[in-house]
Amino acid sequence: SVLFADISDFTSYSSNVSPKVIVEELNNIFSVFDDLVDKYNAEKIKTIGDNYMIASGIPYKNRLHAETVIDLALEMKDAVKNINKNLGLKIGISSGEVVAGVIGKRKFIYDLWGDTVNVASRMEKYGKNHEIHISKPTYEIVKDKYNFSDRSIIDVKGKGQMETFFLKNRK
């Protein structure tokens, strides 16, 4: 399972504070995220600006990969709220196969590719502030363990019509 998180409102927030405060704030948030990744034995893939990417089930199999990223996401949401009430978090999650590997000649990077990665990214992009937006494959894995609200069918760029869900909490 792959998770993308975007600190919503960070761009407008950062236009009103000094660069030093921006770096400190982002470092505080990402440090908490790093600790949560360790707590859940997940894999931090990368950060890009105010975006954070996580996976579970790679490089080592984890039959609870979907639950792992969902529980992590719930704690990430609470963490951002506790650190800065002016910021929100949009999270997208999808589950399925990925290709993983190390690329590069100088700055090596472990990265992921594939449809699951693209769908998780789209779930974040089409999500809402303070919401965890999940794809149907993830929903099918965890539907008996969490509460959801139905997002209904949405048109997802590059994918067409998709049924998606907003995760509320653990049952």
Named regions from a protein language model:
Residues 40-41, 45-48, 78-92, 153-156:
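Catalytic core regions of nucleotide second-messenger enzymes
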Residues 123:
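ATP phosphate-binding glycine-rich loop and adjacent ATP-lid/helix-beta elements
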Residues 103-114:
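Short, surface-exposed loop/helix-turn segments at secondary-structure junctions
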Residues 118:
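Key residue(s) within conserved catalytic/signature motifs
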Residues 55-57, 86-101:
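A short glycine-enriched loop-to-beta-strand structural element that forms part of the catalytic core
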Residues 98-100, 126-171:
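Cytosolic regulatory/linker segments at or just downstream of nucleotide-handling modules
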